[in-house]
Amino acid sequence: MARWKKFPRVTDVRPVARDAWWSTLVFSATAAGLAVAAGFVMFGAFMYYDDEGYVLISLRNFVEHGGLYRDVYTQYGPFPFVFYAALHGLGLPLTHTAGRLLTLAAWGSVALLCASLAGAATRSLVTRLAVLAAVFVYLYVLSHEPTHPGGLIVLVVAALAAFGYRWLAAERTRPWAIAAGAGIAILLLTKINVGVFAALSALAWFLLHHRDDHVRRWAPRLLLVGGVLVPLALMRPLLGTPWVRTYALAFACSAVATVGAASLAAGRRVDGRELRWGLATAGAAAAVVFAAIFARGTTPADLLEGLLLGPLRQPVSFSLRYVWPPGMPAIALASTAAFVGARWLRRRGNAGIDVAVATLRLAAIVALALALMGFPNVGPDYRVFAFALPCLWLFVWPLAGEKQNATDARTWVGLLLLGQCLHVFPVPGSQIAWGSFLALPLAAIGAWDATVWLARRFPRAGGRGWRAEGLVLRLAVAVFAGVLGWRLTQLAARYRDGTDLGLPGAEVVRVPSDYTATLQLLTLNAVAHGDMLFSLPGMFSFNLWSGLPTPTHANVTHWFSLLKPAQQEAIIRALEAHPRACVIKHREHIKFLTQRGLAPAGPLDAYLEKNFVPAFTLDDFEFCVRQGRHIEPLMLAEALTLASTPSPDPARPENTVVRMVTLLPAGGAVASLEIAAPGEPSGRPLILNSADARLEITPANLHGEPVGPTASHRWPFRLNGPAIVSIFFDRNGRPRPSRGALIVLRDYAGGELALARLRE
């Protein structure tokens, strides 16, 4: 009996012992390595739907003009605007680079908080490492939407879980109440639905652990009813769709089982004093934020519309579909039935039910590990979210003999996760990971507790412990953490294969070379040919890169479904006042929306369709100008077959010319051109230089119109302004330029001077 007692008593709460120096070193080195890998992931992608640009331009407009909700459109609360305005006042530029660095800091902080949470419960280095790596992997979606309020949301939720667990385990309910009040206020003022979900979680924990026996007796019944009604009320506008009905059922079943499990051994911990502390802190935080936006022109009516009424209309305006696993309703009902049966057996003194729950916890975490191991080929969040709901009650269930304060602290994390699982409605995108990431530390804590509990419950014959098995288990967990970390570094390798975007505020963002060329080309042509820029759907990074204004300050990605008719009419009037206005359309994104029943429509969409036509098309992007206007695009070449005319040099026959209006960085001398097939920049390129190509240059203006005579020119060539560059060569026996090909202009040393594309 003495030997198995040497297992860590993870259910005991005691002061955290200082880690050995090597443990701290290993954890710190691992965290640093994962953060570096995450940094490369963060700067190694740019998403076509460009929520990043929408958020950034809204932040800039608020900082420069004020009028949040009145003039500056946003779907989110005022806190992110006040937060970024404060940082901007301290010197932070509102750029893609700065926003990505802040999102990276939030990403890493969430991983550290979750690892700290697991460490506080288990005192295990390998568990901390596994949770650290798992959360980095699970929240990789943060790299898809830098600067988005989702980064702030997961940071606040992680802090509520981590600090709340520590304080509740240490029986410090006042700090928990203060932190909960502040955190919930921030969430309410960032994304109101997420704040409401966190508030409901805190209320549930408060009622279940109230010192008043009468409150505690009625709390489970009240919460069970609430757990069924809340999803029905939230999802009422879309309950006619099958995926939403399944969602409401799965959540209601999970809420019934989780609240029921939490009520089995809830201690008497809080009363009105903690409630007053929480409300006072929340009120103080809200007052600071409200004062800041009211001082910048927002009225109470604007705030009511933007913070509450507008979000209530969003499920009807824009929603996506989550594909549940087959048989999910049956799984949810079976899980609830299993809980009811387990509770019935527990009340009758059946000790074996705890063994079953502990064993099921271990099975669940094995399934979780397998889901995580699918990264990066398969995003783990989609599968984890679905099964987190029916499994949640297992990790809240109090095992016999557990310390009360540890159980209460774990219950707090479980209830917080339960509430956040509603975040996925009505748009199951990145919200899936944001709403379910707490499943990782909770599963780690619950599985550790189950392992130790089972080891104590079933000591080895003769007093022998489970030391060897424990070492094997630790090794397996360490290998799991290592594999996840390695896979994150493999994903980070894409940064090495990309090309710097090189656009203002996004200089070090890297994407594939042909995509870089497309984004640069569209931005350059917007500067050259426009004085105002709009896009369909909203891609406002182009405005940030080009410096061109949007028609109004009401900017959002899906403006066709979220902006009111009056706001769309204001944009039409602004475009009418600018004959040189340009519009960029992304046909692939429009097709994606149309296939999901979200096709753009409304007065502004009809106006754009009638009055703007494509000047050129590239990679499903259409660069549109006003009807009847003609422009010559910059850095978009065409390859032409020459008529049978004699070459100036009979020894060098010519049958092809590549011609484009070119604008180069000052001082750069072009020694060669490389033309590679689209999507295959590393393949065999067509190389044109002084050895086999003749050069002619015609001075031009930004509109592509000649302003001087055409003259032959020697390689290398420099340009002092726009020019029409014509390169003559013989294509026989050489790679043929293909439509949409990437063109790289290089100097003598092989350095990249500029990128261009061949017409499609």
Task: For each feature predicted by the language model, list its residue ranges.
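Membrane-interface transmembrane helices that cradle and orient dolichyl/undecaprenyl
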Residues: 157-179, 187, 205-220, 233-234, ...
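Transmembrane-helix signature of polytopic, membrane-embedded enzymes
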Residues: 114-138, 154-155, 171-178, 305
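Extracytoplasmic catalytic/substrate-binding loops of multi-pass membrane glycan-assembly enzymes
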Residues: 43-58, 68-86, 93-97, 298-300, ...
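Membrane-interface alpha helices of multi-pass inner-membrane proteins
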Residues: 175-192, 198-206, 224-240, 283-290, ...
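Transmembrane-helix motifs of polytopic, lipid-linked glycan transferases
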Residues: 101-123, 159
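Short acidic/glycine- and proline-prone juxtamembrane loop motifs at membrane-interface regions
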Residues: 143-153
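Short periplasmic/luminal acceptor-recognition loop of GT-C membrane glycosyltransferases, typified by
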Residues: 75, 491-561, 571-576, 580-594, ...
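Hydrophobic/aromatic-rich transmembrane helices and adjacent perimembrane loops
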Residues: 196-197, 380-398, 407, 411-413, ...
